[in-house]
Swiss-Prot record:
Family: Belongs to the aconitase/IPM isomerase family. LeuC type 1 subfamily.
GO molecular function, one term: 4 iron, 4 sulfur cluster binding
Subunit composition and interactions: Heterodimer of LeuC and LeuD.
Top-level taxonomy: Bacteria, Pseudomonadati, Pseudomonadota, Gammaproteobacteria, Enterobacterales
Descriptive protein name: 3-isopropylmalate dehydratase large subunit
Residues where [4Fe-4S] cluster binds: 347, 407, 410
Keywords: 4Fe-4S, Amino-acid biosynthesis, Branched-chain amino acid biosynthesis, Iron, Iron-sulfur, Leucine biosynthesis, Lyase, Metal-binding
Length: 466
């Protein structure tokens, strides 16, 4: 029987499935950070349990960390406690921790792939909703809650029901300058922010195959923003070349044997999906969100939509509420909207290719008066590579702030946040009310588009920048 990639991954990890019961899955990798793990470790301690597979569990600090100093006290009392608890718990339970002083420290979904912790064919979980990022490797990766974190720590297994399947086919080639971020925002614009609910999404088509691994990670990172459980891209030579030689990747003959298996991880001819969505890559322009969910998105050349143009009454009401919160008037060109802050970073867009794209726009230009622009590399290795390439100097010379790795302004859990009413062009993944700070107004864009907003002071079409 022909199977989808998701069905192959799921079935390969079923440990036990009783009749009319939820299947029990084996978990290959468990990624841990400081926010969703303290209660889970406390639960182990309370019941006298150990971490079942400490060698398959990897921890880092990212959500709460300061991006201006490596001082654990810099982000406030709650953050300090969470980070100290992680240090204590990892030491007690034998889990490898990339703490603030470790060269590999960074955002969990950047650190995993770059260290070869993430490999094709795996099941990967983390107490974080953007765990879908790792699906770019052809791994079944999804976020879990703190009680599930405890269960995986204790058993290396998790009960999971089967999801429905969705194929998103992005046909043809994308135009020059169109990035994975533009593609995924255009997809969510078409499906809506709940269009993938109950599904695992597989991204297919020529435009997807053309993406680098970093682009594919951006794509899968935002699968959750269309309501999907996880996102997948089938592994290919691009995947194998990225993984080869990384710290935790197989070596020598083991790697060759792994690749032989990984090549079987693709949807069979004749396999059927519950839902199929098709887009033409050539029609995708640079994207900018205008509202308070990622599905409220338009091309940079468009005008802010009129709520009356939405036939669905729920969408119309949502648009009215979003425009009021965002302080926008329908009908005005998006390029007339001025910004106060720019954030280039997050688990969506803080890898080396993202920073190169932003630096290309920033080079020889200056951040517009009155705009604060932050560039936050996703990890220690990304920061080191960017500095070796001189990208930090380009940003600093242009007036951007060059920061230490961390989740930063993606979410208001550290010192990097918006003040009420401030408008931000952000490369992150969520534009919900208050996501970047109470009363903050978030517009999601690609790294190049964020840099363009920084130097012009408003949203600008990168295709027209001279």
């Amino acid at each position: 029987m022909a199977k989808t990639l998701y069905e192959k991954l799921f079935d390969a990890h079923v440990v036990y499935e009783a009749q009319n019961e939820t299947p029990l899955l084996y978990i290959d990798r468990h990624l841990v950070h400081e926010v969703t793990s303290p209660q889970a470790f406390d639960g182990l301690r309370a019941h006298g349990r150990q971490v079942r597979q400490p060698g398959k569990t990897f921890a880092t600090m990212d959500h709460n960390v300061s991006t201006q100093t490596k001082d654990i006290n810099a982000s406030g009392e709650m953050a300090r406690i969470q980070m100290q608890e992680l240090i204590k718990n990892c030491k007690e339970f034998g889990v490898e921790l990339y703490d603030l002083n470790h060269p590999y420290q960074g955002i969990v979904h950047v650190m995993g792939p770059e260290q070869g912790v993430t490999l094709p064919g795996m099941t990967i979980v983390c107490g974080d909703s953007h765990t879908a990022t790792h699906g770019a490797f052809g791994a079944l990766a999804f976020g879990i809650g703190t009680s599930e974190v405890e269960h995986v720590l204790a058993t290396q297994t998790l009960k999971q029901g089967r999801a429905k399947t969705m194929k998103i086919d992005v046909q043809g080639k994308a135009a020059p300058g169109i990035t994975a971020k533009d593609i995924v925002l255009a997809i969510i614009g078409k499906t809506g922010s709940a269009g993938g609910t109950g599904h695992v999404v597989e991204f297919c088509g020529e435009a997807i195959r053309d993406l680098s691994m970093e682009g594919r990670m951006t794509l899968c990172n935002m699968a959750i923003e269309m309501g999907a459980k996880a996102g997948l891209v089938a592994p290919d030579e691009t995947t194998f070349n990225y993984v080869r030689g990384r710290l935790h990747a197989p070596k020598g003959k083991d790697f060759d044997d792994a690749v032989a298996y990984w090549k079987t991880l693709k949807t069979d001819d004749g396999a059927t999906f519950d839902t199929v969505v098709t887009l033409q890559a050539a029609e995708i322009a640079p994207q900018v969100t205008w509202g308070t969910n990622p599905g409220q998105v338009i091309s940079v050349t468009d005008n802010i939509p009129d709520p009356a143009s939405f036939s669905d009454p729920v969408e119309r009401a949502s648009a009215e509420k979003a425009l009021a919160y965002m302080g926008l008037k329908s009908g005005i060109p998006l390029t007339d909207v001025a910004i106060d802050k720019v954030f280039i970073g997050s688990c969506t867009n803080s890898r080396i290719e993202d920073l190169r794209a932003a630096a290309e726009i920033a080079k020889g230009r200056k951040v517009a008066p009155g705009v604060q622009a932050l560039v936050v590399p996703g990890s220690g290795p990304v920061k080191a590579q960017a500095e070796a390439e001189g990208l930090d100097k380009i940003f600093i010379e242009a007036g951007f702030e060059w920061r230490l790795p961390g989740c930063s302004m993606c979410l208001a859990m550290n010192n990097d946040r918006l003040n009420p009413g401030e408008r931000c062009a952000s490369t992150s993944n969520r534009n919900f009310e208050g996501r970047q700070g109470r009363g903050g107004r978030t517009h999601l864009v690609s790294p190049a588009m964020a840099a363009a907003a920084a130097v012009t002071g408003h949203f600008a079409d990168i295709r027209n920048l001279k």
